[in-house]
């Protein structure tokens, strides 16, 4: 199972850690505008490797975990990039 998380913060990171514990055969890909967050997530084993929006065509699941105002811009890009059987979760929070 190929899971992509866009926005590797508390919510997105927590979700993929749970997915990894329940489905250890999953491969977790991370997309984040903050390169240091992405590098830290890889070093900590939260995600397996970095990805780009173009890579979303391979996704089984996409978790969009960005602030709601950013999600409005990101979701159209995600929907244009994914396959017809990909499941997308939007889990942004309003603070």
Residue ranges with predicted function:
Residues 1-53:
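NAD(P)+-binding Rossmann beta1-loop-alpha1 motif at the extreme N-terminus of oxidoreductases
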Residues 91-95:
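Rossmann-fold NAD(P)-binding glycine/threonine-rich loop
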Residues 53-89:
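Rossmann-like NAD(P)-binding element
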């Amino acid at each position: 199972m190929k899971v992509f998380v866009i926005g590797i913060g508390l919510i997105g990171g927590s979700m993929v850690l749970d997915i990894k514990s329940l489905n250890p055969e999953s491969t977790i890909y991370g997309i984040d505008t903050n390169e240091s967050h992405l590098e830290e997530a890889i070093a900590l084993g939260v995600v397996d490797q970095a990805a780009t929006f173009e890579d979303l065509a391979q996704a089984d699941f996409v978790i969009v975990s960005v602030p709601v105002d950013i999600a409005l811009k990101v979701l159209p890009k995600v929907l244009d990039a994914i396959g017809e059987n990909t499941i997308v979760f939007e889990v942004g929070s309003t603070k």
